Amino acid sequence: MKDLLNLLKNQGQIEEFDAIRIGLASPEMIRSWSFGEVKKPETINYRTFKPERDGLFCAKIFGPVKDYECLCGKYKRLKHRGVICEKCGVEVALAKVRRERMGHIELASPVAHIWFLKSLPSRIGLLLDMTLRDIERVLYFESYVVIDPGMTTLEKGQLLNDEQYFEALEEFGDDFDARMGAEAVHELLNAIDLEHEIGRLREEIPQTNSETKIKKLSKRLKLMEAFQGSGNKPEWMVLTVLPVLPPDLRPLVPLDGGRFATSDLNDLYRRVINRNNRLKRLLDLAAPDIIVRNEKRMLQEAVDALLDNGRRGRAITGSNKRPLKSLADMIKGKQGRFRQNLLGKRVDYSGRSVITVGPTLRLHQCGLPKKMALELFKPFIFGKLEGRGMATTIKAAKKMVERELPEVWDVLAEVIREHPVLLNRAPTLHRLGIQAFEPVLIEGKAIQLHPLVCAAYNADFDGDQMAVHVPLTLEAQLEARALMMSTNNILSPANGEPIIVPSQDVVMGLYYMTREAINAKGEGMAFADLQEVDRAYRSGQASLHARVKVRINEKIKGEDGQLTANTRIVDTTVGRALLFQVVPAGLPFDVVNQSMKKKAISKLINHCYRVVGLKDTVIFADQLMYTGFAYSTISGVSIGVNDFVIPDEKARIINAATDEVKEIESQYASGLVTQGEKYNKVIDLWSKANDEVSKAMMANLSKEKVVDREGKEVDQESFNSMYMMADSGARGSAAQIRQLAGMRGLMAKPDGSIIETPITANFREGLNVLQYFISTHGARKGLADTALKTANSGYLTRRLVDVAQDLVVTEIDCGTEHGLLMSPHIEGGDVVEPLGERVLGRVIARDVFKPGSDEVIVPAGTLIDEKWVDFLEVMSVDEVVVRSPITCETRHGICAMCYGRDLARGHRVNIGEAVGVIAAQSIGEPGTQLTMRTFHIGGAASRTSAADNVQVKNGGTIRLHNLKHVVRADGALVAVSRSGELAVADDFGRERERYKLPYGAVISVKEGDKVDPGAIVAKWDPHTHPIVTEVDGTVAFVGMEEGITVKRQTDELTGLTNIEVMDPKDRPAAGKDIRPAVKLIDAAGKDLLLPGTDVPAQYFLPANALVNLTDGAKVSIGDVVARIPQETSKTRDITGGLPRVADLFEARRPKEPSILAEISGTISFGKETKGKRRLVITPNDGSDPYEELIPKWRHLNVFEGEQVNRGEVISDGPSNPHDILRLLGVSSLAKYIVNEIQDVYRLQGVKINDKHIETILRQMLRKVEVSESGDSSFIKGDQVELTQVLEENEQLGTEDKFPAKYERVLLGITKASLSTESFISAASFQETTRVLTEAAVTGKRDFLRGLKENVVVGRLIPAGTGLAYHSERKRQRDLGKPQRVSASEAEAALTEALNSSGN
């Protein structure tokens, strides 16, 4: 018995380990794993079904087929355990050993391992310094390779074909050694002296000048050092022994009908064994060379197919023409070992069913069908029945449950009480996709779900299914209750706003009950308290919308958290008074004294949570839901065709627009405007008309005429059903109503260009055939987009999770001083995001001073909450430096202070929170809502007409930012810089709005001027780009020869002539390299200079520029010399939506990126080359100038002699994030990427907190490139983890050596995931083969720091409750280890001990 217990004990033992190392296996190692050699290709005997001896399923090698029973049956039972049968040679043991015992095949000739050969870059090729092509020719027996040249003129590693080989043989006899096949490669690898080679390479690298050569050499050096450091030997990349997988992992299962299903691996192994045996026989027979060679080649191919079928040549196919699944295929891809079995497993104690509404449930409950519960909780029920003595054995209990006896239901109810279950809806896009509920037993077969959690699950009841899981252990139940209960997840982790927000019917009901109507029944009544209102309403004395006076007893929670009672009389409506009955104590009446739209309800719940806490908010949310359902039923809102009221002005607006379009058409016909201008104008026109129609329609819908108590006719807000739905936010939007009752508007073609003819009809009037046909474009594109979008969005989330999975909060404070500068995000005239919203929940990095003084009002280290936000607003603070994940200095992980508030909990983030995964989910989850392109509403194109002026919204003081301008004769300013901005500041000096001013804008105000709201302060022509003079003078044309560089156009109507610069492509040969220009001269004919420089005032004209002046005309400052027509707007396909987000996270370089100045200095142009201009920037401090060749077609924003600062835009275009990082630093990059990504999400109305994007950015900035190696072990140009460089530099600092210098590098998320320190995480993400090959060669260790690695090896993850477990284990390990002390410390301790004992 004792033995049995010991045996069982051994089985359950888990191995403790801290890291996993992967390496190459030596032949000795493979033999040591093996339990015997597989010599025959046979599997099992077809008559007896017993495994053949020495075959692929041999029991002698791999173990017995039945537990404790040898093959011939001589020894049976446990008592013979460990005996080896003398007849059949099988050891008596558990049959389970067939899953773990390996065999081996002794190969008659060495075989190269295909992974190290073909996985790029080829490791074997790098080591031998041969190309992959050459090595393959040797391996597959096409050429000889010289192994030992002896005293001949040949070189080691030289390739010889047959002729050359035989010539060499005749010439030198056997002074040299040249062979072919894997043996030759094995010999060459064996002969490498790593020490010597590494020394040689280290000397060679500093002496080479060519970049490519250095790259190649450092690659080789890295690989050699990896081999040297890891203890792998190069010759192990060529196999002489092949391991054989345990048979139970490649099973052979009998099907009915006498056939067998087998794993593909058996076929592949069989091929190898057959060819190997044949080769042995041929070698014994001393067969002719050519035959042996062919056989060796076939053996190499067979082993290739076994390891990675299809990597070289055609994949070997089975009987049914599909390629066989090799060992490599087993682990990679979605169906591979990593993703199918290690990262996600199917679990027991789970079930799934359709969901339906449970409007009567409480928030923490879900309805669970009895049948399901009975099955899920079976073991618990058996235990209870037995414990109660109702059943004597488990078998009896099982019978009772199967018969469904009445006492079983009682026991079930008891078991389920207080036992939470987890509900999950696929796709689980964020952590709220799994929540815990207390089950309530219900009849029927569908799970009932509380309506308020639908938003979190993104569930609806049109046939969605959900899965139920039972947490078994006490700890699991505890976590489910404390962390995952739906009542604990009121706020969304993405933005910190409530996610338990009523929608649709509930909103409709609450909105309906809080609306007011003029002259409703009971208007003007006064009530003593809420109960009286209730009675009046129920008895029909007062209508729900009647305006009444009510005496309210409200309890208000003060700053100190105490409730103070307050009684007052308020003007309100009956419905609002009724709603106040469910509002928890502590909130004032004003929160419900308004019509409750969706936004207001969300605000109310948020406010409630912050004021009265979690418990009351949950109860309140439930009450709101019940109330909302009740009153939406009472309201009886429905939609009929008559609700779509078409505005009377529609016809007038459309006729006016049509006339204008005709006018533009005639201008085009007479050549006044170009095709592009016509197109732009027409589209602007219709966009405007559409807006007017929808304004008229909304105005029309939102008001209705009623008679008040005095008998006068007055306007009141309409009770039109459709208007109420849209207005309350229950369903529908203005854009949709516009299509129903206004006009459908402009449509886009599939390629994104807008069709000029709009659809003037709406759905109520109905569409004609042409209009219907135009509509189909958008509708179909919408459907196609949706299908693509879902897949793309899921893939984006997967990449994000993978890059950020190991980012966990590991300490409270990293002590950094750095942070990001936050200011309100102002776009156009609007403050898109005020400062308060951006800093809420962040920690201040540097003291905030009162504007205009040096009094500290917020000390560094303060966590900004709602109260502080209000305070900053009151103190009119404009910018704050906050801690950020990007600047956090924690080595592994991130610190709580840099992260700030845990958005889903509302307090500082806990240690152990997996902030990386939360960030990834928060960004990925709304991905499906992002369109693929940005401009669709059912195909209706939304394009605002191009801005041509700045009209300020608020009054205030004008501020001009980095605006270069000249003053025109009439006193107006003309902008001559591109980065100029105009801002309006209020009386406190806070910026309220900010606008970009394009080049050539005419500005009618000056710095410091006061303006009134609505004033137009700047104007420009949006369709052309002017060139403005900066001095007075006379025009002189340079290189403007008619018919060669320019062509003259005369307008028939006006008789004016324009000169148009020809495109270099269309010019005759003589004009190709001439650059037409306009220069300014004085009366004496001397060149005028630009003010403040010694550069002549000369303006080069790009292709298609139009000049209206004649040679010799007089111009004054600020005049326009030439116009460049701007391109038509093809809804300037800003890659919208999802692709844009993916591009930013992948850090892709845009096609034609903007060109930034590399250094600060003065611009000049050097000698031109064919098709390119040479731009030279000369620094003002006299250091070396910087040169860059720029294609001639790029339109430059700078003129000769202009001063630029490092990082300024020289030529417009989409920004390249890598340039921003290199020239402007990390914080500018962070600002750019955060704003760009937020713009995409904001367009869709999705709110995501900045810190999630910053968290991902931190992971993208993990790597640095070594620019100078100093005394470190890094090589210049190496990409290494920032933490590695910092650690090594610290080490070097203590030894007074030179540290390495480095530049930060931005990696895209895919690349960053693949270059993580953990090879398990990288291999389970993508490119499994490549990752594992690289890891094996370098002998990598995975310290299992991230979440993914720990899931794969089946441990608790080092986050959340698992972090405590991991740190405890680490502490235990450290206790076991002796502490390391330096010699000096030991000496000091010793002397101290001696001294003290001496006393």
From Swiss-Prot:
Q: Which cofactor does it need?
A: Mg(2+); Zn(2+)
What reaction(s) does this enzyme catalyze? RNA(n) + a ribonucleoside 5'-triphosphate = RNA(n+1) + diphosphate
Q: InterPro entries from the entry?
A: DNA-dir_RpoC_beta_prime, DNA-dir_RpoC_beta_prime_bact, RNA_pol_asu, RNA_pol_N, RNA_pol_Rpb1_1, RNA_pol_Rpb1_3, RNA_pol_Rpb1_3_sf, RNA_pol_Rpb1_4
Q: Where is this region: Disordered?
A: 1367-1399
Q: Name one GO molecular function term.
A: DNA binding
Keyword check for ATP-binding, yes or no: no
Q: What cellular component terms from Gene Ontology apply here?
A: DNA-directed RNA polymerase complex
Cofactor binding annotation:
Binds 1 Mg(2+) ion per subunit. Binds 2 Zn(2+) ions per subunit.
Query: Which HAMAP family has this protein been placed in?
Result: RNApol_bact_RpoC
Q: What's the protein name?
A: DNA-directed RNA polymerase subunit beta'
Organism for this UniProt entry: Pseudomonas aeruginosa (strain ATCC 15692 / DSM 22644 / CIP 104116 / JCM 14847 / LMG 12228 / 1C / PRS 101 / PAO1)
What lineage does the source organism belong to?
A: Bacteria, Pseudomonadati, Pseudomonadota, Gammaproteobacteria, Pseudomonadales
